[in-house]
Design a protein with these regions (language model features):
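Short alpha-helical
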Residues: 83-84, 199-200, 224-225, 252, ...
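Divalent metal-coordination and catalytic microenvironments
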Residues: 13, 68, 76, 98, ...
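A structural motif corresponding to the C-terminal end of an alpha-helix
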Residues: 66-74, 92, 154, 185-189
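Mid-to-C-terminal alpha-helical segments outside catalytic/metal-binding sites
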Residues: 1-12, 19-70, 238-243, 251-285
């Protein structure tokens, strides 16, 4: 069996093409000229074919739904911040899954906001970008711990960027080895990595073997570049740990992703888990 075409994919990373000002938080800490003054998208040097022409669309929700329908995506996880996302969640609760971007630097304000969004939207996940904060916050920093504890209390996962970040900002706060401390201190936490874990994918696999709650999502990687360690792990002992995530419209088009996906060498029994079942379980859908 090849990649199934009618499974009802769950995409755990989708955004809306609302404007390039959403990247200003990265420009604030970058020091190179291209990131601060030239690039519309801070990782243009990596993503040459980003669908930038979609940004500024009159109806960004309609644009995203159209693309989801084209490629068989039944549901997509989005942030619950901002008017566009909140409209999408209200108008299409059967298509969009609410998550919240958290910032440990905001302390108890974000803990209270997590509870508010859980009660208002039925929050299904928290998301974090350690290298994107100002100041940056290491994955195992004590400032993160109240957020991890609240995720355990609400019984929701947290999706966290790990590995060398794409933007030209410092990387130390996202080293994969830091995840070990978190999983040790929060054995009940469901922790899903984002953005590759490179160059430490072999370590990520070892940690997933060690910690039941640790998972890996494929966000920000075109399928032709999925790490070999991750594909091999999915095909052996990790079929329940690897979760599909795209990067539309931030850096990748769904057309590119779904044109390349059939060439990923997953075994037959891995595809349904990768494209749908693992996300449904982790997000309690």
């Amino acid at each position: 069996m090849s990649m199934p075409l009618d499974i009802g994919v769950i995409d755990t990373m989708v955004g809306f093409p609302v404007g390039f000002e959403i990247y200003d938080f990265i420009r604030k800490q970058a020091k190179d000229w291209d990131t601060r003054e030239t690039f519309q998208f801070p990782v243009e040097y990596l993503f040459k074919g980003a669908p930038k022409d979609l940004f500024g669309a009159d109806d960004p929700v309609a644009v995203v739904l159209h693309e989801m329908d084209r490629f068989g995506i039944e549901r997509a996880m989005i942030g619950c911040e901002g008017d566009v996302s909140q409209h999408a969640l209200a108008a299409h609760p059967d298509r969009f899954i609410p998550s919240m971007s958290v910032d440990p630097n905001r302390g108890m304000d974000d803990i209270r906001k997590m509870v508010e969004n859980y009660e208002r939207f039925g929050l299904k996940a928290a998301t974090a970008f350690p290298a994107g904060y100002v100041p940056q916050v290491p994955i195992n920093d004590r400032r993160f711990y109240p957020i991890y504890a609240k995720c355990c209390e609400l019984d929701i996962p947290i999706f966290v960027c790990a590995g060398v970040p794409g933007p030209r900002i410092k990387m130390a706060c996202q080293q994969v080895e830091l995840i070990d401390d978190v999983m040790y201190d929060f054995p009940d936490l469901t922790f899903v990595t984002r953005h590759g874990c490179e160059p430490w994918t072999d370590l990520a696999v070892k940690l997933m073997l060690k910690w039941p709650g640790l998972h890996y999502s494929t966000s920000a990687f075109a399928p032709k570049y999925y790490p070999r360690d991750i594909i091999d792990y999915a095909n052996t002992r990790g079929a329940d740990k690897i979760i599909y995530a795209g990067y539309f419209p931030m850096g990748l088009s769904l057309e590119r992703i779904f044109n390349e996906l059939p060439n990923v060498g997953f075994k037959d029994d891995v595809w349904p888990k990768f494209l749908r079942e693992n996300a449904a379980r982790v997000l309690k859908l």
